[in-house]
Each structure stands twice: as structure tokens, then as C-alpha cells.
A protein has these predicted regions:
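C-terminal substrate-binding subdomain of Rossmann-fold SDR/epimerase-dehydratase oxidoreductases
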Residues: 52, 194-276
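Residue-level signal for the nucleotide or nucleotide-sugar donor/cofactor binding architecture
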Residues: 84, 92-95, 133, 140, ...
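Residues in well-ordered alpha-helical elements
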Residues: 68, 80, 87, 98, ...
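Hydrophobic alpha-helix immediately C-terminal to the catalytic Tyr-X-X-X-Lys motif of short-chain
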Residues: 148, 152, 156, 189, ...
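Active-site "substrate specificity/gating" loop of NAD(P)-dependent dehydrogenases
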Residues: 124, 136, 141, 178, ...
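N-terminal Rossmann-like NAD(P)+-binding domain of SDR-like oxidoreductases, especially those catalyzing
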Residues: 1-172
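Hydrophobic aliphatic residues
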Residues: 74, 104, 181, 193-194, ...
């Protein structure tokens, strides 16, 4: 049994992950500021601590509890917010991460699992499916901070010997996904279809994404939590894309969901968004 801290564990993916750690017998603490997470998402059996990852008390918690594993899902993940307020994005995604990393280093945490994003760190890659070794060309401050987080993890590994792994998610969907935010097009489209409302597509809808089910993402997290690796020589040695390798256009996704919901397809097209 391991003692596991899941940051962002009241959110969409983090709460499923907290469930999974509990089910396999781990002791789980969920840390979340509830800005986007929901208290009811925290599974029974997990201890809940309401804190922001930038708060000094989050670091104190890590030093006091001596976790075996930290799975870091808390983040500012709205691309549009990162474009309009890059300082805030960096404050959460870099300053918050460093608060945890310094405490983890001092507490000698065994494994740090970091959530990155394959959807933003590569930019518009030429090769698809995109390998982990592809050039990193983020096109938004959010992508920059996610890639920066990976570099910080690699630094702590190289200099301090911290064991870590980075998961570069594609577009995750599934139960508990927020249908009201900027991310989560599957949940957004599904909710609007069931309400009989039109779908808004930004751009021409021919842009493609890789959509992966949250249960598969959880399975990847568990496998990589337990995996052992040789000492890393480069950034991509400890980074893993998590997706299906299948491209789906936004237009095709809208049509598929409309068919599954047995609703008419009514799409309104809007200008493409910056950083998306």
C-alpha cells in the first residue's frame, strides 16, 4: 500500500484517479481548491484537504505526511485564460508546481506523476500520430507552462534524483467532465445536444483531435505510477503520450454525437480562437 497525494482530485480526471488508487488499496489524500473541482467528486475513503497548490500549507502537508507518490493534476488548463492572463497561468502551473516540487524533494517523495498535454506542447506537429520525440512548439502560454513543468521535473530528476514521469494527455472525455468550461468538447456538445441547443464550432471544424476515454487515462496513470525506469538522459525519456492515435475532426465528432443522441445536427461556426 502506498500513501498517495492527488492534487486536483476533486476534478474530472483527478477524482477518477483517486477512485482507482483507493480501489487498489492505497491511502489517498485529495488536495483541491474547489475553484473548478467539486466536493462531491471526492470519493468516500479519501481524505480531503481544501488548499491551493500555491499555498505554503500545501508544501507543509507534503513534508508532514511523507507521501510515497504525488500525482499532480491541479492546473490552470484554460487556453483562453492563459492567452489573456499569462501571469496567472504561470503562477498556477509553474509557481504552484515548484511549491510542490520543493516540498517533495525535502520529503523524499518516491514518485512524482506530472500531467502534461500532448494537445499543446507539440503545437501543430507535422507527424501524426505524433511521437514523444517530436519538436516542442507550444502556441499558447498554457502549452509553454506545461512544457516548462516537464523541464522542471527533469531538472529535479537530474540534480536531486527525483523519480518522475510525465503524461502528455490528448483530449480526455468521460463522466464528471465539466460541460460549461472551455475544455471538454465532448461534454459540451453532448449537453447542448440533449438540450436541443445548437453546437458552436470554432474555425471550419476540420481541425482534428485525438479523443481518449478517462478510464484509459486512469489505467495509464496506474501503470506509470508503478513502472520503473533507468535514469533519464533527456526530457522525452520520461514522457508518454496518452491517447488512441486516431484523428477525429470536430465536424465528425459533432455528427457522431448527434447520431448517438438521436438529435438533429445544428452547427454554428465561429472564428477560430487564439492559442487553440
Amino acid at each position: 500500500m502506498s500513501r498517495v497525494l492527488v492534487t486536483g482530485g476533486a476534478g474530472f480526471i483527478g477524482s477518477h484517479l483517486a477512485d482507482a488508487y483507493l480501489q487498489r488499496g492505497d491511502e489517498v489524500v485529495v488536495l483541491d481548491n474547489l475553484v473548478h473541482g467539486r466536493r462531491e467528486n471526492v470519493p468516500a475513503g479519501a481524505e480531503f484537504v481544501e488548499l491551493d497548490i500555491r499555498d505554503a500549507r500545501a508544501g507543509d502537508l507534503i513534508r508532514e505526511r511523507r507521501f510515497d507518490v504525488i500525482n499532480h493534476h491541479a492546473a490552470q488548463m484554460d487556453v483562453r485564460v492563459s492567452v489573456t492572463d499569462p501571469r496567472f497561468d504561470a503562477s498556477v502551473n509553474l509557481d504552484g508546481l515548484l511549491n510542490l516540487l520543493e516540498a517533495a524533494r525535502e520529503a523524499k517523495v518516491r514518485k512524482f506523476v506530472f500531467v502534461s498535454s500532448g494537445g499543446v506542447v507539440y503545437g501543430e506537429p507535422e507527424q501524426r500520430p505524433t511521437p514523444e520525440s517530436a519538436p516542442k512548439q507550444p502556441e499558447s502560454p498554457y502549452g509553454v507552462t506545461k512544457l516548462g513543468g516537464e523541464y522542471y521535473l527533469h531538472y529535479y530528476h537530474r540534480v536531486h534524483g527525483m523519480d518522475y514521469v510525465a503524461l502528455r494527455y490528448s483530449n480526455v472525455y468521460g463522466p464528471r467532465q465539466d460541460p460549461h468550461g472551455e475544455a471538454g468538447v465532448v461534454a459540451i456538445f453532448s449537453t447542448r445536444l440533449l438540450r436541443g441547443e445548437p453546437l458552436t464550432v470554432f474555425g471550419d471544424g476540420e481541425q482534428t483531435r485525438d479523443y481518449v476515454y478517462v478510464g484509459d487515462v486512469v489505467a495509464a496513470n496506474l501503470a506509470l505510477t508503478d513502472a520503473t525506469f533507468p535514469r533519464s538522459a533527456g526530457l522525452d525519456d520520461r514522457a508518454f503520450n496518452v491517447g488512441t492515435g486516431i484523428e477525429t475532426s470536430v465536424n465528425d465528432l459533432a455528427a457522431t454525437l448527434a447520431s448517438a443522441a438521436e438529435r438533429p445536427l445544428d452547427v454554428h461556426y465561429a472564428p477560430a480562437r487564439a492559442g487553440a
